[in-house]
Amino acid sequence: MFGVAVASSSPTVAARCAFANAGIGAVATQNITDPSKGPRVLNLLKSQADALEAIETLQDSSDFIEYRQILVVDREGGTAIHSGKHTLGTWGEAATKNAAAAGNLLADKSVPRTMINAFEETENSDLHLTDRLMIAMRAGNDAGSEEGPIHSAGIKIVDDMPWPIVDLRVDWTDDCPIDALDALWARYKPQRDDYVTRALDPTSAPSYGLPGDT
């Protein structure tokens, strides 16, 4: 299972920045982002490159790579991060096996390390990966987050299916987007497995419980 969680002062951040493929890995493209780098890295991972090799390939062959901040987790839990010299404002990065965190325009460069610490603290729990990433993202927010207010957030999770089993976004709010995303997850979580069942075997799927659904 792989996932990406992201929050930003910019609108619709997850639409541009979160990429993951089941059995392959996860990628976040940040800063002055180029969304094409997400699928490209996933293709490199699919071709048996590890996280570091994928980052090194981008560094050697991509235009404007110094404007990008790219995080990779590969199928073995290996991690790599590229933060170019034009990464905006105060920036930071941190990684451990199975997880990487980075940010720009931060209130404090220690924010990513705080996120990794929070993620590691839930390692032996029964929490779903979505919950673990939400906890890490909230820890980063509590540690200062961006220097200015954040307005959008999203989370994407892949597992055994060729589509994301969780793909939730708050594209803009004047309130805390992490709170809004957490509320959306709380609503979706009890139904998550039912939507997979409806895709694989509609005859055994539960009713939607909506007017007109018989």
Language-model segments: residues:
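N-terminal nucleophile
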Residues: M1-T214
